[in-house]
Amino acid sequence: MRALAVLSVTLVMACTEAFFPFISRGKELLWGKPEESRVSSVLEESKRLVDTAMYATMQRNLKKRGILSPAQLLSFSKLPEPTSGVIARAAEIMETSIQAMKRKVNLKTQQSQHPTDALSEDLLSIIANMSGCLPYMLPPKCPNTCLANKYRPITGACNNRDHPRWGASNTALARWLPPVYEDGFSQPRGWNPGFLYNGFPLPPVREVTRHVIQVSNEVVTDDDRYSDLLMAWGQYIDHDIAFTPQSTSKAAFGGGADCQMTCENQNPCFPIQLPEEARPAAGTACLPFYRSSAACGTGDQGALFGNLSTANPRQQMNGLTSFLDASTVYGSSPALERQLRNWTSAEGLLRVHARLRDSGRAYLPFVPPRAPAACAPEPGIPGETRGPCFLAGDGRASEVPSLTALHTLWLREHNRLAAALKALNAHWSADAVYQEARKVVGALHQIITLRDYIPRILGPEAFQQYVGPYEGYDSTANPTVSNVFSTAAFRFGHATIHPLVRRLDASFQEHPDLPGLWLHQAFFSPWTLLRGGGLDPLIRGLLARPAKLQVQDQLMNEELTERLFVLSNSSTLDLASINLQRGRDHGLPGYNEWREFCGLPRLETPADLSTAIASRSVADKILDLYKHPDNIDVWLGGLAENFLPRARTGPLFACLIGKQMKALRDGDWFWWENSHVFTDAQRRELEKHSLSRVICDNTGLTRVPMDAFQVGKFPEDFESCDSITGMNLEAWRETFPQDDKCGFPESVENGDFVHCEESGRRVLVYSCRHGYELQGREQLTCTQEGWDFQPPLCKDVNECADGAHPPCHASARCRNTKGGFQCLCADPYELGDDGRTCVDSGRLPRVTWISMSLAALLIGGFAGLTSTVICRWTRTGTKSTLPISETGGGTPELRCGKHQAVGTSPQRAAAQDSEQESAGMEGRDTHRLPRAL
């Protein structure tokens, strides 16, 4: 019976797939196909291609068992947050659509032209809207309330009211110089093997790594001035301001080839080619590499927005807010922020690990059980090959122990501050406590970075030249993180990573029970912290051991160039090659272009180059590979330069990093020194605080260096925590005038409120938790008679009743819950990674050759009958205005004598599931994939 049921389902699905496309094509031939329909058809096919590739990726991830390969771990670390994923998918559909239109138009006209030359602006707007891109190109609506001026939005939007998208999450990285693409729009540098730069091809990035960058783990020069914590802070802060998601699919859109299995350049695959003599024994010819997702409205899509005659080359998206706002702690989207908060606490706390403690102190929580398990498993559990990763404001918190340590430290600091602020202000709501603690933590991130970290990287002279003292908010300064900063300049820190993870005992000596680990032994390994003595041994190692010094002939060690993200012996990755390839993927201009941008002289000859790079052997190797100084990749050129005095970068990176930091500071309306953000008393207290004080307050350490970034010897260079100054939170105590008649406001179930002032009056702004909607007045004002209205109510939203934007995919059943919903799958299906789509669990019975044969016979007969009917209807049918075979995907075509019908994809029905795609609004389905049932 089970086999019969499977056969029946197979036949019904086959008939449906065959019948409806033929009927649809018959109607088109009868009445003609309007231009809008042709555009819609291309969009449907593009959605199918993108979603099929994404679906194949999801299925592969679901079925994979065992330890993840380095490439899979890299993909996991670059996995976009759901909101970013929606935007990336929309951009990929947009780009695929335009490429298909290009092929159609060029085939019809027999000449190369852009599809925007052949389509009306109305149709271009339809393409932009139907792809889902258009909403992300429009400026957000900025609330004009007292609350909007008190706390920064989690997305960073509306920081600048004249330019509300500046610095916001999920917007394009800024360009300080135009990109260099081989086709002028999108193709990376090095995409076409025959493309020449100054008469020479670019060298393969792996060759550059092997001959210029890589050194043995044993060849490490220690920094005699700075601790390993300086390196860790740089990486942590980089993750606060920049994250460029990779393509949402790990398979090529044109045919579904797995990017981990192909060595051809097929978007989004841009593999790193390996020289024959350096290939592993298995004979792998390349290392997998995925292109960064394009920002909506750029590259081939660019002509659809703004001036149609102006090219808008491919840009890359920053999934985080650009601002120094502690998004590493709180996230950059409302959805992630909700996940991170403890909603049962009246103290505005963040969630912590429910079971494990570090001598009574909190650990980060694990990701939800439904999320992909990509980290190393707990030791000693038989049969386990993967385990959960930590949940934090940035998804890379589990990459290396030093990052995990800082994420854990700031989680504890938030909860410490929140509890103390609640004790001072018992009348504050949970949301008010949370927002005030978040505000303080964000200010501390800004202070430690600009006061303590950046001057040591740039040196005092360059810091004064490029950053200088704070002179107030500048509404003309664009704080958006630049592409060259994120992709090249701030990656200088990779050359300061030590190959060993050092863990020290209470006397700051090598721990007898916790020996040092090679870095590759600690990648994505939460249990290095949880079962490795907790946070204290790692913090001691970061404080008391030196960073690796960036030396011109010792740039990066083997842990990063040969063993990156290695949890098994299956394969490897190379961070240096990834950095070089990423710069080419993003179209970054060459080294000399950036020197000219910074007012530095161009280096045209070997003698010129030797003035910037003291090591003659390194300079010679670089020129031998690149042939011309203009061809040098900017990351390598900046990395190899001589240090400025008392700095840890050369002149080019000092310029680029300094310009970026000044923009982040001066262009931030919520910068801690701006007069409206804190009171004078609060600013004075914040200035007293330091990273050493944060360590004292949140670990078991009792002695620390006065300056956490300065390496020193224990005990002579360490101070008692009692002598490390910190802020006094009394400056945050809130009092009300004696004549106040409003008193403390009433609490609202499943909601919250915060105080602010408007025109000298106390104001309450209410909000409901996710999954609830507010009924009543959102804002109450204190008058002489009391509050002007009764508090509102928060009512549960039935998300499952939203027919226009269902929360679950059509393959799943939606069940409403209090404050949320559940997507349920019938056995033997299970939820995919998105939590909304049902996919094959691998337990489905497989269709036999008999059922397949019967299905084929039925399809053939049924299709033939339908074809005959349609051809008779359309004996005098109209001719299609656009040619067929636009996708190259082998779509079958129906031919009736001399007439040709526009072919339909066999997956048309599945593509129709995606027609009502989310425009990116909160709560909509973020992964509308082809049906699995």
Swiss-Prot record:
Active site at H239 (proton acceptor)
Catalytic activity of the protein: 2 iodide + H2O2 + 2 H(+) = diiodine + 2 H2O; [thyroglobulin]-L-tyrosine + iodide + H2O2 + H(+) = [thyroglobulin]-3-iodo-L-tyrosine + 2 H2O; [thyroglobulin]-3-iodo-L-tyrosine + iodide + H2O2 + H(+) = [thyroglobulin]-3,5-diiodo-L-tyrosine + 2 H2O; 2 [thyroglobulin]-3,5-diiodo-L-tyrosine + H2O2 = [thyroglobulin]-L-thyroxine + [thyroglobulin]-dehydroalanine + 2 H2O
The portions of this protein that span the membrane are 847-871
Task: Report residue spans for region: Disordered.
Answer: 881-933
- Signal peptide residues are 1-18
Effect upon mutating D240N: In TDH2A; loss of activity
Q: Record-annotated residues binding heme b?
A: D238, E399, H494
PROSITE patterns per the UniProt record, alphabetical = ASX_HYDROXYL, EGF_2, EGF_3, EGF_CA, PEROXIDASE_1, PEROXIDASE_3, SUSHI
Biological role: Iodination and coupling of the hormonogenic tyrosines in thyroglobulin to yield the thyroid hormones T(3) and T(4).
Q: Per the similarity annotation, which family is this?
A: Belongs to the peroxidase family. XPO subfamily.
Q: What protein name does the entry list?
A: Thyroid peroxidase
Which organism does this sequence originate in? Homo sapiens (Human)
Q: Which gene encodes it?
A: TPO
